[in-house]
């Protein structure tokens, strides 16, 4: 596809954090049956004058599930290079990720679409868009207490999270900022057997295991030379592995420092400072909570354990915690690396003490869940990886 064929398509506005700092162009719009609605959208498609907006006036906006689009690449940013490398590592068609490169709004529609990378070459990135209106983040579920009274739903979501985490781990990818705001759930499919409805996002924060400290400039040249081979559905795994060996994550220095400090009392659960496990903030553009930053392979298990605990609390506990108290209590659990479990000797009843003001009885209904969480939160020397946890405790 050349410049002349691209120029006939309309631009779509992107939010400011688009990693390519360029623009999308529409190739065609698809309805539910994948029939072509309109191969070419005129220049007035996004006009404020609704009389000129044939697409919206034809009420086709409700038919869009996916859009095939082309991203014209002039210069790949560092963020884009990281995401592209992760996608090459795990495969462009992974069902375990809500895909990358930011959001954009379709003007006039109450929709938020997120592009999915299909393939790439030296000049173009071919993508399709996923309608994010059908998803909600795990953070939304926890805050809205959508799982209230439904341990079945809680366990289903956790199975999906474990399946996605296993997929990442088996491809030697560590998601460094895994938290409820980075996990998307396909709401309409909850309760089904399709575990791919739970997906991870923010792939630019992933770290490829075994990566070196080579520069992004060398990565850029190596990625460009191999991109044509990765544009097909079945990527050349050998080429991808070679590219990934050259991958440089900006957080490598932090990760190396963490490894040097593994002998201290805090072990690999967190590092002190802004990018620490204890770091919590609501100041980013999506208002996501970031309690911890994953720094090694089996720390992913620890992170999933905290997520499991949050989801369980939102399901079984009636009390709504003040936000600061809730965050501080989670921070203490992360810092200590364990749950505070005690037994009432008079009644021989076990309790989980979330903080000084809130204790939760460990009934037969949730004792297995608590046991699994304790396994995920144990000391790093004995804590299982996601793969080990699934094999040893779930089968």
From Swiss-Prot:
Keywords: ATP-binding, Nucleotide-binding
The protein's name: Probable inactive serine/threonine-protein kinase DDB_G0293746
Binding-site residues, ATP: 15-23, 54
Taxonomic superkingdom: Eukaryota
Entry note about domains: The protein kinase domain is predicted to be catalytically inactive.
GO molecular-function term, one example from the UniProt record: protein kinase activity
Keyword Nucleotide-binding: yes
Family listed: Belongs to the protein kinase superfamily. Ser/Thr protein kinase family.
Organism: Dictyostelium discoideum (Social amoeba)
SMART domains: S_TKc
Keyword DNA-binding: no
Gene3D superfamilies: Transferase(Phosphotransferase) domain 1 (1.10.510.10)
